[in-house]
C-alpha cells in the first residue's frame, strides 16, 4: 500500500483556498491564450501542459527541438507555429536523460532551426542537463527554475519519467502531474513533456502515462513510418481541439529535421480489425512478466482464484497490458505452464526462480 501525504491546514487557510477557487457567474474569466499550434489546430495554451510520446529512436527529441525553435523564433518550424506574448518569451529546456555534450548538440540544433547564431547563448532559452541528479533533486531544481525565471512562457521536460523512482507508482505519478497543474496555473506557462511508449503497444509508459493521458491538453505521438524507416510521423492521439492532419519529417545530411512534404497520411481502417485468438506467450513480451508479477504478489500469496485473476488484470495493466477476464485466465494458464506461478496448498505463489 502506497503512503499518502496528509495535509494539515487551519480552517482559515482552507477558507482562503475555497475563496480562491470559487467560480462566480458574474465574474469575467479570460480564455487561456493560445501559444502553440500545428497548422490551424491548437495544441498548447498558457496554463496547460502537453506531451510527446513515442517508442525509442522515434526522433521525439528532434520533434521537440522544432517546437522550441518555433517558440524561440516566432516562426513556423516543421508544421509548428507559436505566438507567445512578449512577456512570455523565455523558454526553459530540461533534459533528464543526456549528458552535457549531447545536450549541447540539441541546443545547437534548436538554434540552427531558429536561424540564430551558435556562437553565443540565446537570450530567451535556458537549458539544464539534470541527468546526474536524483528524481527528488531534479524536481526541486525545476520548481526553483520555474519560480525564478522572469517572463517564462514555455517549459520543456525531456523526460518526465526521470522525476519518479517508480514509473508505476500511482502516488508519485499523481504528485508529479499535480505539480504540472500547479506550475502551469500559478505561472501561466505551458509545459511540454516527453515520455516513452510501451514496447508492445501504443500506450504511454506506466501510471505516469495514464495520468498524462487524463490531464494533458494534447498528446502527440511520434512514430517511425512502417514503410519508410527514415521517416517519423507526428499525429495527435488525445487533443481538446480538432485533430490536425498527421505530418512527417526526416533527418537530413546535416542532422536536422526537415518536413516530408510528399507524405500522405495513412487511411484509418473502419470497423474492428480481424485478429486471431489471444496468445499471451506471443503477445506479451517476456520482460513484462517479472515486474507485473512483482505487483500482483506485492502483498504475498493469493488464496482465492477470482482475487488472483483480478490482481493479474491490475498487475499487467500497470505494464500497459490490458486484460479482460478471459485474457487474464489465459495468462494464468501460461504462468502455471511456465512454473512462474505455483500452487502452495490452496494459495497461488510467485516463483521468482522461474526460467522462461
Regions found by a protein language model. Name each.
Residues 44, 83-86, 118-120, 147-149, ...:
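Conserved catalytic network of the ASCE P-loop NTPase/AAA+ motor domain
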Residues 61, 136-139, 170-174, 325, ...:
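Non-membrane alpha-helical structural segments and their capping/turn regions in soluble enzymes
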Residues 51-57, 62, 171-258:
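Phosphate-binding/switch region of NTP-binding enzymes
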Residues 5-110, 352-355:
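The Walker A/P-loop phosphate-binding site
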Residues 3-10, 148, 225-356:
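C-terminal regions of RecA-like/P-loop NTPase motor modules
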Residues 85-168:
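Conserved inter-motif catalytic segment of the P-loop NTP-binding fold
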Residues 66-67, 102-110, 141, 145, ...:
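Alpha-helical scaffold elements adjacent to nucleotide-binding pockets in ATP/GTP-utilizing enzyme cores
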Residues 70, 74-75, 110-113, 163-166, ...:
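Conserved, well-folded catalytic cores of nucleic-acid-processing
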